[in-house]
Protein backbone atom coordinates (compact mmCIF):
# COMPACT_ATOMS: atom_id res chain seq x y z
CA UNK A 1 0.00 0.00 0.00
CA UNK A 2 1.31 3.42 -0.95
CA UNK A 3 -0.07 6.41 0.95
CA UNK A 4 0.43 10.05 0.01
CA UNK A 5 -0.67 12.81 2.37
CA UNK A 6 -0.76 16.47 1.32
CA UNK A 7 -1.28 19.54 3.52
CA UNK A 8 -2.28 17.74 6.73
CA UNK A 9 -1.04 19.07 10.08
CA UNK A 10 2.79 18.90 10.12
CA UNK A 11 2.88 17.26 6.67
CA UNK A 12 3.27 19.35 3.53
CA UNK A 13 3.55 16.40 1.12
CA UNK A 14 4.80 12.90 1.93
CA UNK A 15 4.54 9.51 0.24
CA UNK A 16 5.19 6.28 2.14
CA UNK A 17 5.12 2.76 0.75
CA UNK A 18 3.95 0.60 3.64
CA UNK A 19 5.51 -2.78 4.36
CA UNK A 20 4.25 -5.57 6.67
CA UNK A 21 6.16 -3.84 9.50
CA UNK A 22 6.77 -0.08 9.58
CA UNK A 23 8.78 1.94 12.08
CA UNK A 24 8.58 5.72 12.09
CA UNK A 25 11.56 7.51 13.62
CA UNK A 26 12.08 11.25 13.82
CA UNK A 27 12.45 14.28 16.03
CA UNK A 28 9.56 15.67 18.02
CA UNK A 29 7.09 17.60 15.83
CA UNK A 30 8.40 16.01 12.62
CA UNK A 31 5.06 14.49 11.57
CA UNK A 32 5.17 10.86 12.77
CA UNK A 33 1.89 11.08 14.67
CA UNK A 34 0.41 13.32 11.98
CA UNK A 35 0.99 10.56 9.42
CA UNK A 36 -0.79 7.95 11.56
CA UNK A 37 -3.64 10.37 12.35
CA UNK A 38 -3.87 11.20 8.65
CA UNK A 39 -4.46 7.56 7.72
CA UNK A 40 -7.13 7.23 10.41
CA UNK A 41 -8.76 10.52 9.38
CA UNK A 42 -8.78 9.52 5.69
CA UNK A 43 -10.45 6.16 6.38
CA UNK A 44 -12.91 7.91 8.71
CA UNK A 45 -13.73 10.41 5.97
CA UNK A 46 -14.48 7.58 3.52
CA UNK A 47 -16.67 5.81 6.08
CA UNK A 48 -18.47 9.05 6.96
CA UNK A 49 -19.35 9.63 3.30
CA UNK A 50 -20.95 6.19 3.22
CA UNK A 51 -22.84 6.66 6.50
CA UNK A 52 -24.15 10.08 5.44
CA UNK A 53 -25.54 8.70 2.19
CA UNK A 54 -22.94 9.84 -0.32
CA UNK A 55 -23.67 8.38 -3.76
CA UNK A 56 -21.10 7.52 -6.44
CA UNK A 57 -21.43 9.53 -9.65
CA UNK A 58 -20.86 8.04 -13.08
CA UNK A 59 -17.34 9.51 -12.97
CA UNK A 60 -16.48 7.51 -9.84
CA UNK A 61 -16.70 10.39 -7.35
CA UNK A 62 -18.68 10.75 -4.13
CA UNK A 63 -18.97 14.26 -2.59
CA UNK A 64 -20.80 15.72 0.40
CA UNK A 65 -20.57 18.89 2.48
CA UNK A 66 -20.06 17.93 6.12
CA UNK A 67 -19.67 19.69 9.45
CA UNK A 68 -16.62 18.84 11.61
CA UNK A 69 -18.90 17.11 14.11
CA UNK A 70 -20.24 14.70 11.45
CA UNK A 71 -16.95 12.88 10.84
CA UNK A 72 -16.51 9.57 12.64
CA UNK A 73 -13.01 10.61 13.71
CA UNK A 74 -11.07 13.86 13.67
CA UNK A 75 -7.81 14.53 15.52
CA UNK A 76 -9.25 17.88 16.62
CA UNK A 77 -12.76 19.25 17.07
CA UNK A 78 -12.50 21.62 14.09
CA UNK A 79 -11.17 20.39 10.76
CA UNK A 80 -10.10 23.87 9.62
CA UNK A 81 -7.11 23.60 12.00
CA UNK A 82 -5.85 20.39 10.34
CA UNK A 83 -4.55 22.21 7.26
CA UNK A 84 -0.75 22.43 6.98
CA UNK A 85 0.62 25.61 8.51
CA UNK A 86 -2.58 27.65 8.61
CA UNK A 87 -6.36 27.49 8.83
CA UNK A 88 -8.22 25.83 5.99
CA UNK A 89 -10.24 28.59 4.35
CA UNK A 90 -12.77 28.35 1.57
CA UNK A 91 -13.41 30.05 -1.71
CA UNK A 92 -16.51 30.41 -3.83
CA UNK A 93 -14.69 28.87 -6.79
CA UNK A 94 -13.74 25.22 -6.29
CA UNK A 95 -10.50 25.61 -8.29
CA UNK A 96 -9.31 28.34 -5.89
CA UNK A 97 -9.79 26.26 -2.73
CA UNK A 98 -7.08 24.81 -0.54
CA UNK A 99 -7.35 21.05 -0.01
CA UNK A 100 -6.16 18.42 2.45
CA UNK A 101 -5.57 15.33 0.32
CA UNK A 102 -4.98 11.64 0.96
CA UNK A 103 -4.10 9.29 -1.92
CA UNK A 104 -4.11 5.56 -1.26
CA UNK A 105 -2.88 3.03 -3.83
CA UNK A 106 -2.84 -0.75 -3.71
CA UNK A 107 -3.31 -2.02 -7.29
CA UNK A 108 -6.29 0.38 -7.27
CA UNK A 109 -6.14 4.08 -6.36
CA UNK A 110 -8.49 6.28 -4.41
CA UNK A 111 -8.14 9.85 -3.15
CA UNK A 112 -9.99 11.74 -0.44
CA UNK A 113 -9.92 15.55 -0.60
CA UNK A 114 -11.29 17.95 2.00
CA UNK A 115 -11.72 21.70 1.57
CA UNK A 116 -13.67 24.47 3.23
CA UNK A 117 -16.97 24.84 1.37
CA UNK A 118 -18.63 28.12 0.48
CA UNK A 119 -21.36 27.64 3.10
CA UNK A 120 -19.02 26.93 6.02
CA UNK A 121 -19.07 23.13 5.83
CA UNK A 122 -16.26 20.95 4.57
CA UNK A 123 -16.50 19.63 1.02
CA UNK A 124 -15.40 16.00 1.28
CA UNK A 125 -14.77 14.25 -2.02
CA UNK A 126 -13.75 10.64 -2.65
CA UNK A 127 -12.46 9.57 -6.08
CA UNK A 128 -11.81 6.00 -7.18
CA UNK A 129 -14.78 3.76 -6.58
CA UNK A 130 -13.05 0.34 -6.54
CA UNK A 131 -10.72 1.09 -3.63
CA UNK A 132 -13.13 3.72 -2.27
CA UNK A 133 -15.75 1.07 -1.54
CA UNK A 134 -13.18 -0.97 0.40
CA UNK A 135 -12.02 2.08 2.36
CA UNK A 136 -15.64 2.98 3.20
CA UNK A 137 -16.62 -0.45 4.52
CA UNK A 138 -17.57 -0.07 8.18
CA UNK A 139 -18.30 -3.75 8.83
CA UNK A 140 -14.90 -4.86 7.49
CA UNK A 141 -12.57 -1.89 8.12
CA UNK A 142 -9.69 -1.51 5.70
CA UNK A 143 -6.45 -2.71 7.25
For the regions a language model picked out, list residue spans one by one.
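P-loop NTPase switch/coupling surface
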Residues: 1-143
Amino acid sequence: MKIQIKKFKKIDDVTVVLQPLNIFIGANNSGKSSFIQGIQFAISGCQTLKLKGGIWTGKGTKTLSLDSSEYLYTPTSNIEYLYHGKRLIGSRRREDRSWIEFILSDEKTSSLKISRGKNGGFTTSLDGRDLGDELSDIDNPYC
